[in-house]
UniProtKB/Swiss-Prot annotation:
GO terms for molecular function: rRNA binding; structural constituent of ribosome; tRNA binding. This is Large ribosomal subunit protein uL5. Keywords: Ribonucleoprotein, Ribosomal protein, RNA-binding, rRNA-binding, tRNA-binding. The gene is rpl5. GO terms for biological process: translation. Part of the 50S ribosomal subunit; contacts the 5S rRNA and probably tRNA. Forms a bridge to the 30S subunit in the 70S ribosome.
Amino acid sequence: MSEAEFHEMRDPRIEKVVVHMGVGEGGRELAKSEDILEEITGQESVRTISGRASQDFGVRQGEPVGAKVTLRGESAVEFLETALPITDLSASSFDETGNFGFGVEEHTEFPSQEYDPQIGIYGLDVTVNIVRPGYRVKKRDKRSRQIPSSHRMTVEDAVAFIESTFDVEVEE
């Protein structure tokens, strides 16, 4: 984007980061994963509930199966500064509206975590939502409107934002 085309309302920002651990069962395993998630993010986790029963996985409807944390603002940026160097991002991880997700196979890859045989190893999923100012117009209840296509985030905009902000290389 050239100097003449720059406008502060086109400057992307991180709306939220959702960190999710799917354990598939409740009990001790879920409690361990919640503790790990809270250590990594510095925020209290919320349990996720199964939406439907699945005999293949041995899960009943309404049963807790995982935990998640939603980070916003400065805490989301701080988390991404530690999580993005751990993983390799590819352009296929981005959707058409500029959001992206990635997985971390082992929680021990985070600098603050060490392997504990009592706990084991858990993986986690990270989903990042990138928006431009004014996006609330679409989400609000009263007088909601569509965001013009010229103001929507694209894959190229999101990749450029992530590469410049977090000094990370996104592979093609």
